Amino acid sequence: MPQYVPPPTPQYALESGPVLLKDGRTATLRPATPEDRPKLIEFLARLSPQARAFRFFSEIKPETAADLLLRQHPGEDKVALLVLTGDQQRAELTDQQRAEGTTPERIIASGEYVQEGPGSTSAEVAFLVEDSYQGRGLGSLLLERLALIGVRRGIRRFHAFTLAENRQMLEVFKASGYTLHSHRESGEVEVSFDIEPTADTLARFELRERVATVASLEPLFHPRGVAVVGASRDPASVGYRVLENLVLNRFQGPVYPVNPAAAETPGEVPVVGSMLAYASVEDVPWPVDLAIITTSKDSVLGAAESCGRRGVRAVMVLTTDLEAEQIRALTALCNGYGMRLVGPGSLGVIVNYPEVQLCAGLSSALPPKGRIALSSQSGAVGLAVVEYARETGLGLSSFVSLGAKVDISSNDLIQYWEEDEATGLILLYLESFGNPRRFARLARRVGRKKPLLVVRPGRDPVVETLFKQTGVVRAENLEEMFDIAALMAYQPLPEGPKVALLTNAYGPAMLAAEAL
C-alpha cells in the first residue's frame, strides 16, 4: 500500500487568492464566471495563433473559444480557474477611475478540468498561458491547484491531450512529479497520471513555492534603489527619521526623498535633507525596487498607486491606524501591480549583509553583523531586540517588522532565510499564526537546516504540540530567547554524544545530569 502523503497547504484558499509567479511578481487566482466572457475574449485575442492552436487544436475565434471555456456540462464536475494581473492595465487608468477605486485586471492564464462523466473519478485537464507570461511557472501553478481541488472533490486521475510539438505543456507535466503514462499517435500525445499527492509532487510544490517566494522578496533585501514617500524636512517626523537612518547607516544604493510639498515650492531647489526631492515616485528617473511609505493614512493609497505605476517591486508601509477598508484596498492594489507589501504598521527592515547595509525604518543604527535573522509582529518588541543586539554584540543578518502582515508573513520570511547564506539561525516573535498548517510544514523542513527559535505570548496546548512536533525551540521570554540565541549562534554542536560535567557542587551536577 502506498504511503499517505498529506497534500501541500498554500497560503490562501486553493481556488482564490494571491499567487506568486516564478519571477516574484504577484497575481490573483480565482474561479471563472460567466461575467468573465469579455475579459476571456480579450485574453484569447492577445494570444498568438500558435498558442490558440496548441490549446484548441485548430484556429478558432476568440468568442467561440471563450464560450467553450465557460461552458458547463450538466451533471459533470468542472473547475475553471483564471490568473489575472493588473500590472499593466492599472497604469492606464484615468484619475477619475482611480478615485472611484476602479481596478481593471486582465487574464493572463486559464486552466480547467472537466470530469469525464457523472460519478467518474477521471477528468481531462488543460491550461493556457499568454505568450508574454510563459516561462513564469503559471502552467505548473494551475496544474498544482487543479489537482489539489480535484482530489478534494473525488477526482483521482487526470488525462490531457496535446500536440506533439507543444513541448512547453509536455514539460509542465514532466516537471510535476506525477508518474506519467503517455501515448503518441498521429502527431498528438495523450498524457495520463494519478493526482494523489506523493513525496515527489510535494517536493516539487515546495520547490516552486520557495523559488517564487525568494524571488518576490529580493527587492526587499537587495533593493537597487529606495524611495522614502513622505520624506519631510521636519526632524521630528517619521519620514525625516527614516531618510536620516538610511543615509547615516550608509545604504550603498541611491535614496530618493519623495515629498510633493518640498518639490513644488516656487523658487526653491526641491531638496529634503540636502538631497534632491521628487513630487512623486513616478518622477524618479532611475530604478526603485523598495518604497517606504510614511504619509498620513489618507494618502497611503495614492502613494501606493504611484509606486505601482512606477514599477516598484516592494512597498513597506509604516503608517498606522488604517481603516479595515483602506487595508483591503491597499492589499488589492499592491497585488494588482505585482508588489509585495510589508505592513501596514511596520517599523522597518534591516539588512546587514556584507554587500547590503539597509537600515530602513525607525531603528537608528545597525546592529553588529551576524548570522541571526529576526522577524517580529510587534514593532516595539522587534526594535527592543535590535537595540539589545547592538548593546550586547549579538550579530544580526536581517530584521523585519511585519506590522499587520496582510501580505508578507513570517512564513514567507522563513522560506527566504532558508536559502539565505548569511543566515544560520531564525528568531520569530509570533502573536498569531496566519496559516498554522503551512507554518508547521515549513518549520519542519527548514528546521533540518537552520534552528527556529520562537517567542509567543500566552500558552496554548495546540501550539505547544505544534512546536514539539516540528522541532521549533520555544523561549519563555525575551531574556531566555537572547540566551538561547547566543548559544545557538556561537556555540558549535558537539561532535559526539560524550558529555563531561565539571562542577564544584554535587547538587547542580545532579540537576545537569538529569537534564542531559
Label each PLM-derived region with a short phrase.
Residues 198-516:
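Catalytic-core regions of core metabolic enzymes
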Residues 2-219:
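Long, contiguous binding/interaction regions
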